[in-house]
């Protein structure tokens, strides 16, 4: 959700029970404004909150003028002081995939994981136990990256792609119509396209290259991983991810108000294919 309209956005997303105390809201409003100024970001998004056993991580993201350029991620434990996180790498994601359970809420906390490694001694091969330590900060970076790639979404038309390459905020976007807002095909993944590149020319024939340049939600696997509901007498559409419980997207049809927020434990629902 955009930090410039934080209070309205929190109110629209509150139907899922994702609220903040008045003092946290006030701290966020002020500190995110300073983050935008100090880091010179084009936009700052309040990404959400990852719940820990000792403390919670409040996450924000800074966007450059090109909206699909890699986003800078920051975290805070008190909504006042923000620390920049390193970009996610494949090695980080692989390392963190072995860690299960809740976050602690301490970035310096280290998880211990035991791995078996083969050791050659002459002609004999032995398996040796090695203890690998993984920092919670590494896991935090990895989980945020996975959630971004899997379930960060925007409505069709909110961004447009120029013929020269960069992607900008569409200032003429006035919201989806009520009928369009009820369709999963009206929402895109907020990242570089993956599936779009595999489509045939015939499938791309009806697409507008300036608007339909990202992957649509309608072909997400597993099918049925999104819940879509109309609330407040059709004045608000809410999408919830069943794959990453805690991710809520909201949009008020025929208005510019949209956004997503994640409030959860940072754990993926691996059982979803068996639950559908």
From Swiss-Prot:
Where is the protein found, in the record's own terms? Cytoplasm, Cytoskeleton, Cilium axoneme; Cytoplasm, Cytoskeleton, Flagellum axoneme; Cell projection, Kinocilium
Top-level taxon: Eukaryota
Q: Which UniProt keywords apply?
A: Cell projection, Ciliopathy, Cilium, Cilium biogenesis/degradation, Cytoplasm, Cytoskeleton, Disease variant, Flagellum, Kartagener syndrome, Primary ciliary dyskinesia
Keyword flag Cytoplasm: yes
Under the cellular component aspect of Gene Ontology, which terms does the record hold? 9+2 motile cilium; axoneme; kinocilium; motile cilium; radial spoke head; radial spoke head 1; radial spoke head 3; sperm flagellum
- Residue ranges annotated as transmembrane are none
Disease in which the protein is involved: Ciliary dyskinesia, primary, 12: A disorder characterized by abnormalities of motile cilia. Respiratory infections leading to chronic inflammation and bronchiectasis are recurrent, due to defects in the respiratory cilia; reduced fertility is often observed in male patients due to abnormalities of sperm tails. Half of the patients exhibit situs inversus, due to dysfunction of monocilia at the embryonic node and randomization of left-right body asymmetry. Primary ciliary dyskinesia associated with situs inversus is referred to as Kartagener syndrome.
Functional description taken from the UniProt entry: Functions as part of axonemal radial spoke complexes that play an important part in the motility of sperm and cilia. Essential for both the radial spoke head assembly and the central pair microtubule stability in ependymal motile cilia. Required for motility of olfactory and neural cilia and for the structural integrity of ciliary axonemes in both 9+0 and 9+2 motile cilia.
- PANTHER family recorded for this chain? MITOCHONDRIAL RIBOSOMAL PROTEIN S18, RADIAL SPOKE HEAD PROTEIN 9 HOMOLOG
Query: Subunit structure, per the record?
Result: Component of the axonemal radial spoke 1 (RS1) and 2 (RS2) complexes, at least composed of spoke head proteins RSPH1, RSPH3, RSPH9 and the cilia-specific component RSPH4A or sperm-specific component RSPH6A, spoke stalk proteins RSPH14, DNAJB13, DYDC1, ROPN1L and NME5, and the RS1 complex-specific anchor protein IQUB. Interacts with IQUB. Interacts with RSPH3B. Interacts with RSPH4A. Interacts with RSPH6A. Interacts with CFAP61. Interacts with LRRC23.
Q: What is this protein called?
A: Radial spoke head protein 9 homolog
- Give the organism, scientific name: Homo sapiens
Annotated gene: RSPH9
């Amino acid at each position: 959700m955009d930090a410039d309209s934080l209070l309205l956005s929190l109110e629209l997303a509150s139907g899922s029970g994702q609220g903040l105390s008045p003092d946290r809201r006030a701290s966020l409003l002020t500190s995110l404004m300073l983050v935008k100024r100090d880091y010179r970001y084009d936009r700052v998004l309040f990404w959400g909150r990852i719940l820990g056993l000792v403390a919670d991580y409040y996450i924000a993201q800074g966007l450059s003028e090109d909206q699909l350029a890699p986003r800078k991620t920051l975290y805070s434990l008190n909504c006042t002081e923000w620390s920049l996180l390193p970009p996610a790498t494949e090695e980080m994601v692989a390392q963190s995939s072995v860690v299960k359970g809740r976050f602690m809420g301490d970035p310096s906390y280290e998880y211990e994981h035991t791995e078996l490694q083969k050791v050659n001694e002459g002609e004999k091969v032995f398996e040796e136990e090695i203890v690998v330590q993984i920092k919670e900060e590494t896991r935090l970076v990895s989980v945020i990256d996975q959630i971004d790639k899997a379930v960060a979404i925007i409505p069709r038309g909110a961004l447009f792609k120029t013929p020269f390459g960069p992607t900008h905020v569409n200032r003429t976007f006035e919201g989806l119509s009520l009928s369009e807002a009820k369709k999963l095909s009206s929402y895109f993944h907020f990242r570089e396209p993956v599936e779009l590149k595999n489509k045939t020319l015939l499938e791309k024939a009806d697409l507008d290259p300036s608007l339909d340049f990202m992957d649509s939600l309608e072909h997400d696997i597993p099918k049925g991983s999104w819940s879509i509901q109309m609330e407040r007498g059709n004045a608000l559409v809410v999408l919830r991810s069943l794959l990453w419980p805690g991710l809520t997207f909201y949009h008020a049809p025929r208005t510019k108000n949209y956004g997503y927020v994640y409030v959860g434990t940072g754990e993926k629902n691996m059982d979803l294919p068996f639950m559908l």
